[in-house]
C-alpha cells in the first residue's frame, strides 16, 4: 500500500514560493544553481529570535535587503536580480491560480503581489542610489561623466523592448533580448511619487539623447524616439523632462548650435537627410549611401531612395509632433515647451543671414524638421475656411515677450516708426490690459483657444498679456519656416546655381585641355569633378527630404494661405483700392512673412503636382493688391517676387491648366487691376535703391513682359490695357513706354557690340597657328571671356526681343502715347537705330554661323521694327511722325527705307506692309527737306530762344521752379520720364510744377512768324548729312 504525501502547511508553501521568487535560502542547500544565495547571517539572526527558518511576508523586505547588501560571488547584480524577482513573482502568481483552496490561493496572491511591489520599489531605490547596495555596474560622477559614459540606464533596454524596438547593441545596452516582466514598467513609473522617479527619468532622457547624437535618418533612431514618446506620455515623465537642466540649456556661451547639441530634444531634431558641417556630420552618410554617382544610377534606384528617405523623415516628424503635443496638452508643461521653442528660434536668428556660421547656428536639418513639426501643430487651425484666424493677435508681433520680432525688417515701417508706434500703442492700451486679459481667460475654456501664460516669471505688466496658443503657434511657425524650410529652399536654389556654374566651368576647363593640355588643368578638372559630385549629393538630399515630400509642401502652403488672408484682414479684406493710409499693424509686420509665402509659391510652382488641390485664389488676390503698392510693401524686390509667382502660374499654352487660366481670366480683381499694376511695377522697378538696380530691373521686367504678352491675348485684359493707355496717356503709361524704349535700345546695343567681340575671339581661335603661340594664361582668359560673352549676348538678345515684340503688338492698337511730343522723337530714334543696324553697311559684321544660339533672329526683328513704323504711321493723324524720323541726326538716312524694303521682299513680308513702309520713308524724306527749308528761313536763332539742353528752338518754353532756367516743355518732359529731378540742380521736379514762360513764347512765335514770311534763299544743299551708302548684295538677312 502506497504511503500518502504529507500535507504542507500554508507557512511552508509561502516559504517555498518566496525562495523561488528571491533565489535565497535560509538553510544550506545542495542546489547547484549559483544564483541561489544562502543567507547564513540572516538565518542565524532569525534563529536567535526564536523563529522558524521559513521565509514569510513579514521577513520579505529584510531578506531582500540582506540579499542586495551582501557580497555574494556569482550573484546577479542588483537590477537584473530585482527584475528577475518581479518576473518570478509574476510566474508564481500564475501557478497559484490552480490552487483549489480559495483561502490559501488568496493568501498566496497577497504574497506574490507584495513581492512584485517590493521588487519595483527596490529597483527605484537602486537606480536612484546606485552605490547603496554595491555591486553596481553603473559609473558615478557629474553630468559630464554621465554624458560620456558608454553604459545606459538598465531600464532603457526594457523600455525599448516595451515599445517594440529591434537590436539594442548600438545604444551601448545589453542585447540579451531581456524584456520587462508583464506590468513591471507600469508599476515602476506610475505607482510612485515624482521625487523618487525624477533622477531616474532625467538620466533616461540623457541616455536617449546620447543614443541619437550624430545619427542620420538612415540610422536606427526609431527605438529612442518611441522610448521618448513613451516616457513623455507618463505625467511624471513629462514633468521630469521639462524640468531637466538640459531642457533649455543655459550658459554664457549658449548659442543655436550648442542648444542643438546639449538640449534633450536637440539631437532628435538633428536627425536628417540634409548634410551638416563636417564637425557635426551624421552617420550613415545619406548622400554617399543613396546618391553617390547619381548620374549613373537607374531612375528606379533614385526613386526608391527618395521614397525611403521621405518615409523615414515622416516617422521622425510624427514622433516629434506627438512628443510636443503631449507636452502642450498639459497645463503643467505647456509653458516650458513654448519657452523651449522660443529659445531655439531666438538663438538661431542669424540663420536668416545669407552666410550662416555652422558653429554658432543649429543645422539646417534641425530647422527643417522643426518646420515640419510646427506645421503639424498648426493643422487644427488650418481648416479650409480658416475659421480660427481671429485668434491671431497682431500685437503679439510687437508686444509678445517670447519672440524678438520688432527688430526684423518690416513690410513698410522703418525701425524708428515701429519703435515709436509700439510705444504709443502700449501707452494707449495700458488701461485696457486688465479687461483684455479677462477676455483671454474666458477663451482658455475653449480647446481651440488653449492659452499659454505669457511669461514664466511674470515680472512686468507687459508680460501679463496672455495670447492664445493659436496665436503663439502661428508666429512661432512663421519664424521657424523662415529659418528652416525657406532657408533650406534658398540653399537648394543656390546649390543648383553653383552646380550649373561649376558644370560650365568644367566644360571650359575641358575645352582648354583639348587645346593645350597641362598637369595643372588635369588637377583642376579632377578637383572640380569631386566638388560637383559632393554638391550633387547634397542637392539630391535636399530634394529627397523636402521637394519630394508633397504633404510637407502642401502643409506649408496651407499655412501661408492663412498668413496672406490674415494679413489682408489687417487692411480691411480683399477689396481695392487699398485704404489711402497703411494701417500700422500691417506696416510693422515682418517683411519675411510675405517674402516666405512668395518664395514657397515659386518653388511649389516648379514641383510637379505640388499645387494640385491648393486654393490659389487668395494668393492671387493678395499679389494683385500689393505688387504695385509701395505704400504698403516698401521693398521693390519683394513686389517683383510677386510677379515671379504670377509668371510661374501663367498658362504657357492652350492646353495649360484651366485652374491657372481661371486665376488670370476669371477673377474680378485680376480683370480690373492686373494689367494696371503690372505696368505700374514696370515703372517703379527702375529705381530700387540697390547698387545693382540697373541690372536687376531687366530680370524683373522680363517676368512682367511675359505676363503682359500673355494678357494681351486675353480680350478682357486687352480692353483694360486700352483704357489704361487712354486714362494714363501722360501718366504711368507714358512712363512705361519710355522705359520700354530705353531698355530696348540698351539691350540691342549691348548685344550687337558683344557679337562683334565674340566674332573677334572666334577669328583669333580659328587661326590655330597664331593661337597656339599665345601664352597659356592668355588663351584661358580669352576662352573664359568667350563663354561669358556668349551667355550675356544670349540673355540680352532674348530680353531685347521681348521688348520689341511688346512694342510691336501694343502699337497695333495703341498709338497715341507713342506720338506725344515728348515721346515721338525718342521712339523714332530707336526705330531708326534698329533699322540702321539691320540693313546698314555694318550689317555684314553681325553675321553669325549660328545666330539662333544667341537668340538673334534678324529677319523676325526687322519685320517687327517695320511693323512698329507702319503701326505708328497709321495712327499719326497730325503727321508728326515723319518729321520725328527725319530729325534723327544719328541714324536716319532716306536710303535705309529703300534698303529695308528690299530685304522685306526677300524674306516674304506682306506687300501692304512694305508699301506703307515705303510711303512713310517718302514722307520722312519730304519732312527732312521741309525742316531744312524752315531752318534756313529762320537763319541765326537768338540764344535766348534755344533750349539749353538740346540747343534747338523752343516751341513751348517753361520755367523750372527751382533753378529758374527756361527749357522746352517736350524736352524736359522727356527727361522727367526717366528722372524726376531738375537737371541743373537736382531738385525734385514733376511735370505739374513746370511754369509756362508766356512772354518768351510770344517772342519766339513772333520771331518764327516774321522769318517764315521772308523768302528763303536758294542754292543750299537739301541736306548736310553724310550719305550712308547701301547695297542690295551680301545682306545680313538673305
Curated annotation (Swiss-Prot):
- What is the predominant subcellular site recorded for this chain? cytoplasm
Cite the record's Low complexity compositional bias ranges.
446-459
Q: What is its EC number?
A: 2.3.2.27
List residues of the U-box domain. Answer: 940-1014
> According to its UniProt record, which reaction does this protein catalyse?
S-ubiquitinyl-[E2 ubiquitin-conjugating enzyme]-L-cysteine + [acceptor protein]-L-lysine = [E2 ubiquitin-conjugating enzyme]-L-cysteine + N(6)-ubiquitinyl-[acceptor protein]-L-lysine
InterPro entries referenced in this protein's UniProt entry, alphabetically: Ub_conjug_fac_E4_core, UBE4, Ubox_domain, Znf_RING/FYVE/PHD
SUPFAM superfamilies this protein is in? RING/U-box
Which GO biological process annotations does it have? Answer: ERAD pathway; protein ubiquitination; ubiquitin-dependent protein catabolic process
Gene Ontology annotations for the cellular component aspect, listed alphabetically: cytoplasm; nucleus; ubiquitin ligase complex
Q: In which pathway does it act?
A: Protein modification; protein ubiquitination
Record's compositionally biased regions (Basic and acidic residues): 1017-1028
Q: What compartments host this protein?
A: Cytoplasm; Nucleus
Superkingdom classification of source:
Eukaryota
What is recorded about the protein's domains?
The U-box domain is required for the ubiquitin protein ligase activity.
State the protein's purpose: Ubiquitin-protein ligase that may function as an E3 ligase in conjunction with specific E1 and E2 ligases. May also function as an E4 ligase mediating the assembly of polyubiquitin chain assembly on substrates monoubiquitinated by another E3 ubiquitin ligase.
Q: What is this protein called?
A: Probable ubiquitin conjugation factor E4
Q: Give the organism, scientific name.
A: Arabidopsis thaliana (Mouse-ear cress)
Q: What is the lineage of its organism?
A: Eukaryota, Viridiplantae, Streptophyta, Embryophyta, Tracheophyta
Q: Gene name, please?
A: PUB1
Amino acid at each position: 500500500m502506497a504511503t500518502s504525501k504529507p500535507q504542507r502547511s500554508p507557512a511552508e508553501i509561502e516559504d517555498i514560493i518566496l525562495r523561488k521568487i528571491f533565489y535565497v535560502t535560509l538553510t544550506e542547500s545542495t542546489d547547484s544553481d549559483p544564483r541561489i544565495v544562502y543567507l547564513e547571517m540572516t538565518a542565524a539572526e532569525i534563529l536567535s529570535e526564536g523563529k522558524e527558518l521559513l521565509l514569510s511576508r513579514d521577513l520579505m523586505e529584510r531578506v531582500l535587503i540582506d540579499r542586495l547588501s551582501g557580497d555574494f560571488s556569482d550573484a546577479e547584480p542588483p537590477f537584473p536580480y530585482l527584475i528577475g524577482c518581479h518576473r518570478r513573482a509574476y510566474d508564481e502568481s500564475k501557478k497559484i491560480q490552480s490552487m483549489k483552496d480559495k483561502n490559501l490561493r488568496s493568501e498566496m496572491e497577497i504574497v506574490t503581489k507584495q513581492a512584485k511591489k517590493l521588487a519595483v520599489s527596490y529597483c527605484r531605490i537602486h537606480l536612484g542610489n546606485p552605490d547603496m547596495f554595491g555591486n553596481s555596474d553603473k559609473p558615478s560622477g557629474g553630468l559630464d561623466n554621465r554624458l560620456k559614459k558608454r553604459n545606459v540606464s538598465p531600464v532603457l533596454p526594457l523600455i525599448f523592448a516595451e515599445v517594440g524596438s529591434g537590436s539594442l547593441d548600438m545604444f551601448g545596452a545589453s542585447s540579451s533580448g531581456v524584456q520587462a516582466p508583464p506590468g513591471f514598467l507600469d508599476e515602476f513609473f506610475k505607482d510612485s511619487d515624482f521625487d523618487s522617479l525624477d533622477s531616474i527619468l532625467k538620466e533616461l532622457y540623457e541616455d536617449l539623447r546620447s543614443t541619437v547624437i550624430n545619427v542620420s535618418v538612415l540610422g536606427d533612431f526609431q527605438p529612442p524616439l518611441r522610448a521618448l514618446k513613451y516616457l513623455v506620455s507618463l505625467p511624471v515623465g513629462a514633468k521630469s523632462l521639462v524640468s531637466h537642466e538640459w531642457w533649455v540649456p543655459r550658459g554664457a556661451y549658449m548659442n543655436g548650435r550648442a542648444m542643438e547639441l546639449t538640449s534633450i530634444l536637440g539631437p532628435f531634431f538633428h536627425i536628417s537627410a540634409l548634410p551638416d558641417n563636417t564637425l557635426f556630420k551624421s552617420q550613415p552618410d545619406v548622400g554617399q549611401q543613396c546618391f553617390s554617382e547619381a548620374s549613373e544610377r537607374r531612375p528606379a534606384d533614385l526613386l526608391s531612395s527618395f521614397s525611403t528617405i521621405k518615409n523615414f523623415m515622416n516617422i521622425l516628424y510624427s514622433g516629434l509632433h506627438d512628443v510636443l503635443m503631449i507636452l502642450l496638452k498639459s497645463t503643467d508643461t505647456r509653458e516650458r515647451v513654448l519657452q523651449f521653442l522660443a529659445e531655439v528660434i531666438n538663438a538661431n536668428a542669424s540663420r536668416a543671414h545669407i552666410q550662416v556660421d555652422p558653429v554658432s547656428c543649429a543645422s539646417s536639418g534641425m530647422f527643417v524638421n522643426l518646420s515640419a513639426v510646427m506645421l503639424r501643430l498648426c493643422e487644427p487651425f488650418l481648416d479650409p475656411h480658416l475659421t480660427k484666424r481671429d485668434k491671431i493677435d497682431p500685437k503679439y508681433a510687437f508686444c509678445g515677450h517670447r519672440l524678438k520680432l520688432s527688430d526684423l525688417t518690416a513690410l513698410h515701417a522703418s525701425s524708428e516708426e515701429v519703435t515709436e508706434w509700439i510705444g504709443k500703442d502700449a501707452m494707449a492700451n495700458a488701461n485696457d490690459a486688465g479687461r483684455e486679459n479677462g477676455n483671454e481667460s474666458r477663451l482658455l475654456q475653449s480647446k481651440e483657444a488653449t492659452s499659454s501664460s505669457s511669461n514664466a516669471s511674470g515680472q512686468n505688466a507687459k508680460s501679463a498679456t496672455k495670447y492664445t496658443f493659436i496665436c503663439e503657434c502661428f508666429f512661432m511657425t512663421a519664424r521657424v519656416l523662415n529659418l528652416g524650410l525657406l532657408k533650406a529652399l534658398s540653399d537648394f536654389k543656390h546649390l543648383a546655381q553653383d552646380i550649373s556654374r561649376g558644370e560650365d566651368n568644367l566644360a571650359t576647363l575641358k575645352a582648354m585641355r583639348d587645346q593645350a593640355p597641362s598637369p595643372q588643368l588635369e588637377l583642376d578638372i579632377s578637383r572640380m569633378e569631386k566638388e560637383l559630385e559632393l554638391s550633387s549629393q547634397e542637392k539630391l538630399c535636399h530634394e529627397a527630404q523636402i521637394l519630394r515630400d508633397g504633404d510637407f509642401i502642401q502643409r506649408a502652403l496651407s499655412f501661408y494661405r492663412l498668413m496672406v488672408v490674415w494679413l489682408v484682414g489687417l487692411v480691411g479684406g480683399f477689396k481695392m483700392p487699398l485704404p489711402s493710409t497703411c494701417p500700422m499693424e500691417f506696416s510693422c509686420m515682418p517683411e519675411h512673412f510675405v517674402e516666405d509665402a512668395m518664395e514657397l509659391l515659386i518653388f511649389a510652382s516648379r514641383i510637379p503636382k505640388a499645387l494640385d488641390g491648393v486654393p490659389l485664389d487668395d494668393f492671387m488676390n493678395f499679389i494683385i493688391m500689393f505688387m504695385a503698392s509701395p505704400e504698403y510693401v516698401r521693398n521693390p524686390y519683394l513686389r517683383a517676387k510677386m510677379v515671379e509667382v504670377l509668371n510661374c502660374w501663367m498658362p504657357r499654352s492652350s492646353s495649360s491648366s484651366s485652374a491657372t487660366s481661371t486665376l488670370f481670366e476669371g477673377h474680378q480683381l485680376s480683370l480690373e487691376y492686373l494689367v494696371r499694376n503690372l505696368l505700374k511695377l514696370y515703372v517703379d522697378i527702375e529705381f530700387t535703391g540697390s547698387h545693382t538696380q540697373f541690372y536687376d530691373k531687366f530680370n524683373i521686367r522680363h517676368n512682367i513682359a511675359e505676363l503682359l504678352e500673355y494678357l494681351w491675348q486675353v480680350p478682357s485684359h486687352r480692353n483694360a490695357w486700352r483704357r489704361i493707355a487712354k486714362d494714363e496717356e501722360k501718366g504711368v503709361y507714358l512712363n512705361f513706354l519710355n522705359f520700354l524704349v530705353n531698355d530696348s535700345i540698351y539691350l540691342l546695343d549691348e548685344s550687337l557690340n558683344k557679337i562683334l567681340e565674340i566674332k573677334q575671339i572666334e577669328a583669333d581661335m580659328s587661326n590655330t597657328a597664331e593661337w597656339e603661340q599665345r601664352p597659356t594664361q592668355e588663351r584661358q582668359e580669352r576662352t573664359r571671356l568667350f563663354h561669358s560673352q556668349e551667355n550675356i549676348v544670349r540673355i540680352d538678345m532674348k530680353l531685347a526681343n521681348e521688348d520689341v515684340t511688346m512694342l510691336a503688338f501694343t502699337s497695333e492698337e495703341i498709338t497715341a502715347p507713342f506720338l506725344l511730343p515728348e515721346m515721338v522723337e525718342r521712339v523714332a530714334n530707336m526705330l531708326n537705330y534698329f533699322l540702321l543696324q539691320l540693313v546698314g553697311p555694318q550689317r555684314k559684321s553681325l553675321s553669325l554661323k549660328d545666330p539662333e544660339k544667341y537668340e538673334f533672329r534678324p529677319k523676325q526683328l526687322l519685320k517687327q521694327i517695320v511693323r512698329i513704323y507702319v503701326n505708328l504711321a497709321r495712327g499719326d493723324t497730325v503727321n508728326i511722325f515723319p518729321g520725328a524720323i527725319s530729325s534723327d541726326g544719328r541714324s536716319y538716312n532716306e536710303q535705309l527705307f529703300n534698303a529695308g524694303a528690299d530685304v522685306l521682299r526677300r524674306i516674304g513680308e506682306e506687300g501692304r506692309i512694305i508699301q506703307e513702309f515705303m510711303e512713310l520713308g517718302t514722307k520722312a524724306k519730304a519732312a527732312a527737306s521741309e525742316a531744312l527749308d524752315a531752318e534756313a528761313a529762320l537763319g541765326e536763332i537768338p540764344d535766348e530762344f534755344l533750349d539749353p539742353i538740346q540747343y534747338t528752338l523752343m516751341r513751348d518754353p517753361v520755367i523750372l521752379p527751382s533753378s529758374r532756367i527756361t527749357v522746352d516743355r517736350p524736352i524736359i518732359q522727356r527727361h522727367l520720364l526717366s528722372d524726376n529731378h531738375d537737371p541743373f540742380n537736382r531738385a525734385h521736379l514733376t511735370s505739374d510744377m513746370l511754369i509756362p514762360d508766356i512772354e518768351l513764347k510770344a517772342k519766339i512765335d513772333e520771331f518764327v512768324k516774321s522769318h517764315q514770311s521772308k523768302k528763303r534763299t536758294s542754292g543750299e544743299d537739301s541736306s548736310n548729312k553724310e550719305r550712308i551708302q547701301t547695297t542690295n548684295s551680301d545682306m545680313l538677312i538673305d
